[in-house]
Structure formats: structure tokens, C-alpha cells
Amino acid sequence: MTNSAPHESLKRARPPHRSTAARERVIARHDMTRPRPATSRDRSLPPMRRAGARRLIAILSGLVLAAFALAGAPPAAAQDWWTKLPGFEPFGGKKTLSPEERRAQNERARDALAQRVAPEFQAEQPLLSHATIRALEAAIGRYQAIAAAGGWQPVPDKVTLRLNDSDGNVSIVRRHLLMTGDLPAEAGTTWGFDNALESAVARYQLRHGLRITGFVDRRTRLALNVPAEERLAQLRQNLGRITALMKLAEAGRVVMVNVPAFRLEALDRGSLVLRSNVVVGRPDRETPEVSARIIEVNFYPYWRVPDSIARRDLIPQIRKDPGYFARERFAVMRTWGAEPLDPSYVNWNSPAVSDYKFRQDPGAFNALGVVRINMPNKHTVYLHDTPLKELFDQSARAFSSGCVRVERVIDLASWLLQAEDGWPRDKIESVLRLKLSETVKLKKAVPVHFIYVTAWASGTGAAHFRQDIYGRDGLEGVAGNDLDDDAPQLSSVTP
């Protein structure tokens, strides 16, 4: 049987009993980690002496925590007291951050990195343009040479690499990015992950539609490991697609949605007017390739739930969570145009419920948001706003049931209505501010095309690649819908 009583030597070593406040006063007098005014001598310590100072602080920190242990305080309480000291800094000299502070710090760092590399790839020409075709042909030549030379070496599974790392895997990434032109030739193929490589990784991530982090995370590693031969095949296949689609961009005003790129472009006589991020359908509910005509814009629309979504999603959700119906402001009717039923009298487990019709009231909570852009087509898909703005922060945005959610939907509506009498931008903003339900029919319908292009090249010559989210390229290495690691788990009751 284990004896849990304190060892006799520890009993003898235990200091006289003091109150908690007294103990803290004693320790505070000898606390070397408390902030003190910086002096020129502090700032001028050479590296060797700074390292010695850090070791001394580590020793003293251990002694402080040991004093708590000898006084009978549990380790968790000692650590809690220690980290709450004014100006507390861990041994490395950096302030301890809360999870929220660390996320915000990482987000700021990512934004700064993105702003540093994004201007290199900003192109004014739209996807469907002769400039894109010329750049794509040049990119095919470069990737032919890379493939002929044997391509690149894959990064081992589960490897992540970031600034200041140093091993052979860093050299693999450097050689890859030298081949693709993301890393300048003078950067070399050393084993060190330096600032030049961080910027090169960010460029690579931008070209592949990945979240810009500057380090080799899981999704970046997967993209790096697509063989050069498959990237070449992807470029060739999409050159054919873009060439065949060129005639669609020749209309006066036209809206193009490139589904796997999660991007919308509005064109006027071939010139780019507006570009926006979009959310598209999940792989099990694909956004179709479709051509239609935009005929009207709805402000504060109702959402008439399609029968398929009602049966697959809404009714099961109500059975699981009876409060969902009222909370999300739905109405239920036996047929369209009939009076709404009292949901408390509906037998939600009855098979007859599958034939009922459902409608969601207008409002910012509505699944369509505050704007719907109607484009009649056999697939009953359309463009609309969304209350889930945070989805646009994701780099992979296949979350819908097939319809397309537009980040800059107000700008798009304003552009569509600019030729309509009485609908300037301030009128639109007034309608939205007053929460008025309005439908504006366009005098001249605007063509809209949902297309599927997974590779192209920009005017700067950079080749861009996207995942084949619906498996339409027939290339194993680029197929899949790999979401960001922090992708949200969403309710499936959505258009």
C-alpha cells in the first residue's frame, strides 16, 4: 500500500504557516520576472548574456513554483497565480495569449502576408478573355518542361513546415517552388524556411485558391503533391474549355460564375466590372452548369422551400427540434396559396407532411438573405445573399444545396439595376434600410452562365489551379472537396 503522507524531510523543510497574502508579499520581493524600467544596459546585452538571463529567469521561475508546492498549494493554483502576475511573460519573452487573441493575431499576420503577395496576381482581364488564353498557352509550355524533367518530389505525409524550420523537407518545397516560379532563383535550395520561402508559399497558396498562411499546412501539402503531369493535363483540359466558352463573354452585359473557383465576374462588352466570392453547392448537391437570363431582383424575399429540401432537410430538422420552425420563422401550408396552418396542430410524423409547402418570412435571418436575383431555369437555381457571411472567409466554399450565394450581392444588384429608371444605388440602400419587400423587373434581361473551369493563367503569366470539387476533370490527383480545417458544421436547411 502506497503511503501518501509527506516525507519527513519535506515536513522539516516546510516553512512556517503564513497567510496567502503574506506568502505573495514575500515572493513578490524576490520576483525577478516582474516588469521593471528598461535601461540601456538591458537593451545592449549581447546574445550570450541574454541567453544566460533567460536561463536564470527559468531557474528562478522554478524556485517560485517550488515554494508554492512546499507551502501546500496545488500545482494548478500555483500556475494560475504565476500567469496572472502583472506583466507576466513566459521564459521566451512573449506574452501569453488567450485562444481568441492568438486567433486574431494569426488572422492579422495572414492578412498582412496576403496583402504583400496579392498585388502580384491582380489581373484586370476576366477569366474568359484572349489574354487568358495566351497566358494559359505559355503556362502549358512551362509545365511541359517541368514534367519532362521529372516533375517534383512529394512532401511526406503529415509533414507541416513553417518559418524557421530546417530539414530536408524544406528543401523539397524550395525546389518545387523554384520550378513553378513562386520562389526567386537566387533564394536557392537550402534546408532553411526563411522569409523568402514564406512569401513563396503564400504565392503558391494564392494561385491554388488556398488560405494564405505562408506555411505548409495540410491542404497546401496535398496541393504540392499533385504530380506535374496531372497539373499539365489540367491546364490542357481547361484551355479547351475556356476556348469553347469564349463566345459567352461576347454579349454586352453578362454574369459569369466559375463554380470550382467560387468566383463571380460581371462583364460589360468583355471588360471586367465586378468580381465577387461566392458559395456553391456541396458535392452531393452540385451547382449545375447552366445558362439563363436574369429577369428580376427581389429585395427582402420570401424563401419558398423546394420540395426536395423540405423532405430531406426541413421536416427531419423540425422533428428533431420542434422549436426550429418558429425560431426560423417558417410557415406551412397544404398547397401554395392556401392559408398557413397552425404548426402546433400539425402531426410532423405523418407521411402527409411530405406533401406540405413551406415558406420562410423575409428578413436578415432568411436563408436567401436580403436579395434574390432570379434567373429562371430547369434546375431552379439562382443567385442570392446569405445571413452566413462568415462562409466567405473560407477558401473552399462548397456549402449550399446548389444555389449560389454572392458576397458582393448588393454591388451586383446595383450594377444590374443601373439601367432601370428610379433605381440608383441610394434607392437600393434605402429599401434595404427600411426592410421593404420589393421586386424590380429588368427592362433588358442579363445573360448569366454557371461554368466549370479548374485551371487558367493570369495576365502576369501565373498558372492558377482549383480542386475539381465535382470530379468532372477525370484526374484523380485534383479531384475532391477538401475544406479548410476550421470549416463550420452547418445546418443542411439551405438553398
Question: Which residues does each predicted region cover?
Answer:
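Intrinsically disordered, low-complexity segments enriched in small/polar residues
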Residues: 39-40, 49-50, 60, 70-71, ...
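Well-ordered beta-sheet/strand-loop patches within structured domains
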Residues: 79-184, 189-211, 218-495
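Short, intrinsically disordered, low-complexity terminal/loop segments
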Residues: 2-3, 75, 494-495
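N-terminal secretory signal peptides that target proteins for export/translocation
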Residues: 1-53
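Sec-dependent N-terminal signal peptides
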Residues: 55-66
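Basic side chains
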Residues: 54-55, 405
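C-terminal segment of classical bacterial N-terminal signal peptides
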Residues: 66-75
